[in-house]
């Protein structure tokens, strides 16, 4: 496999960007080697600058649920661009996308668009604090809610790969208001609320953790968190930046039957362009400026191109589209388990809908501690052999892989064939 041009570009990039990248996980620090520089994407495939062709399971970390350069998405974005990229004023496309979101999730009474998932979660936290007049927030170990200061505490994702449970630059006086507990441990949450429930403004959670690898909520866990929030007057915030419109038409909230006070979105809702959103109960959202005193604003919020891409993408996500995703994702997960067993490599394949992770672990993985027991060395060996076999996986043991509606049976078969040699390589570690 040729990598000469990627290597040259990476050397140049390191003179321009910290670590040579504009987001840490892209640097391949979790697996070693040189990151591939991508020239273009089409459907379920990526093509790097050296001419290598990969079946893509990163999908820009989730947003490309209908694949790369889908003609209908491209057409709607191009139409929007002809009208103007951004106005700094309301536009009809904001209403068009918001109505489609509420059609899929009718319990969202009001929403606000912004420009990233981080912006959405940071704003939701501010709204919860302002609404409740409380300062403390509760999050869970390994759950990543963006790079906002209050949320970079035991945040998983690239922070986990770097071995940094917190980030330098986050003041202790700020971090002290962020309480953390293990994911999937409802009894621990009950004890914390009994001790200091009156100070907790909100509980925020990834309903399906994606940034510690895929972690699946235990039966009744999300419902139990919601009940505790109701009992103690805290708001329940579900971070659907990754799961929203991916694991089902109604997101994880629809899949697991929970109705939070606030929900945050990103990724799929923008169809590959920068976007975020938060919304929920009208009485809470009506406290947001200019309707209320809690300030939130953004120059590019609701920009027409992102609204167009999101609208086109959600429109394409029909019942048949979700059925295809479920069928192919199940085939991939089952096939990976079978091939790992044949190679005598212990793995745990965690999956919810079209997001999954292969953990190189002997025991079930259900929280941050059990995820950390996975072998990153084995994953690294597996990753590089898969890359050579034409499958582009997330370059970290602690990230989710994704499928799109553009993936085919042939893509999955090719990937499973490549995994036979990859598991054999991992078995040597």
UniProtKB/Swiss-Prot annotation:
The modification N6-(pyridoxal phosphate)lysine is found at residue 267. GO terms for cellular component: cytoplasm. Pathway: Porphyrin-containing compound metabolism; protoporphyrin-IX biosynthesis; 5-aminolevulinate from L-glutamyl-tRNA(Glu): step 2/2. Pfam families: Aminotran_3. Its EC number is 5.4.3.8. Belongs to the class-III pyridoxal-phosphate-dependent aminotransferase family. HemL subfamily. GO terms for biological process: protoporphyrinogen IX biosynthetic process. It is an enzyme of class 5 (isomerase). SUPFAM superfamilies: PLP-dependent transferases. It catalyses: (S)-4-amino-5-oxopentanoate = 5-aminolevulinate. Homodimer. It comes from Anaeromyxobacter sp. (strain Fw109-5). It is found in: Cytoplasm. One of its GO terms (molecular function) is pyridoxal phosphate binding. It comes from the Bacteria. This is Glutamate-1-semialdehyde 2,1-aminomutase. Its cofactor is pyridoxal 5'-phosphate. Keywords: Cytoplasm, Isomerase, Porphyrin biosynthesis, Pyridoxal phosphate.
């Amino acid at each position: 496999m040729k990598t000469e041009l990627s290597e040259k570009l990476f050397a140049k990039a390191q003179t321009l960007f910290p670590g040579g990248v504009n987001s840490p996980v892209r640097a391949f620090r979790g697996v070693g080697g040189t990151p591939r520089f991508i020239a273009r994407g089409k459907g379920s495939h990526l093509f790097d600058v050296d001419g290598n062709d990969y079946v893509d399971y990163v999908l820009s970390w989730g947003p490309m649920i209908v694949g790369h350069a889908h003609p209908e998405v491209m057409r709607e974005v191009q139409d929007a661009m002809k009208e103007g990229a951004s106005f700094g004023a309301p536009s009809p496309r904001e209403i068009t996308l918001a109505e489609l979101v509420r059609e899929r999730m009718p319990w969202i009474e009001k929403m606000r668009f912004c420009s990233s998932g981080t912006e959405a979660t940071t704003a939701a936290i501010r709204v919860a604090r302002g609404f409740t007049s409380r300062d403390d927030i509760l999050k869970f170990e390994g759950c990543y809610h963006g790079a906002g200061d209050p949320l970079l505490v035991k945040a998983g994702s690239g922070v986990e790969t770097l071995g940094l449970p917190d980030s330098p630059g986050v003041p202790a006086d700020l971090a002290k208001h962020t309480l953390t507990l293990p994911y999937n441990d409802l009894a621990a949450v009950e004890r914390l609320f009994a001790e200091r429930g009156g100070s907790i403004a909100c509980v925020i959670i990834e309903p399906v953790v994606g940034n510690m690898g895929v972690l699946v909520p235990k039966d009744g866990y999300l419902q139990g968190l919601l009940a505790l929030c109701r009992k103690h007057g805290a708001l329940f915030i579900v971070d659907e930046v990754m799961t929203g419109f991916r694991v089902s038409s109604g997101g994880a909230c629809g899949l697991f039957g929970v109705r939070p006070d606030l929900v945050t979105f990103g990724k799929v809702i923008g169809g590959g362009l920068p976007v975020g959103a938060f919304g929920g109960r009208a009485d809470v959202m009506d406290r947001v400026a200019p309707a209320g005193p809690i300030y939130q604003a953004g120059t590019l919020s609701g920009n027409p191109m992102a609204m167009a891409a999101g609208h086109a993408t959600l429109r394409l996500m029909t019942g048949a589209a979700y059925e295809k995703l479920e069928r192919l994702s199940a085939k991939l997960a089952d096939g990976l388990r079978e091939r790992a067993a044949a190679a005598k490599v212990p793995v745990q394949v965690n999956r919810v809908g079209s997001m999954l992770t292969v953990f190189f672990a002997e025991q079930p993985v259900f929280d941050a501690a059990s995820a950390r027991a996975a072998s990153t060395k084995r994953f690294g060996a597996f990753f590089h052999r898969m890359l050579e076999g034409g499958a582009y996986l997330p370059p970290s043991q602690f990230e989710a892989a994704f499928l799109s509606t553009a993936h085919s049976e042939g893509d999955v078969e090719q990937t499973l064939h490549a995994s036979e040699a990859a598991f054999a390589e991992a078995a040597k570690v």
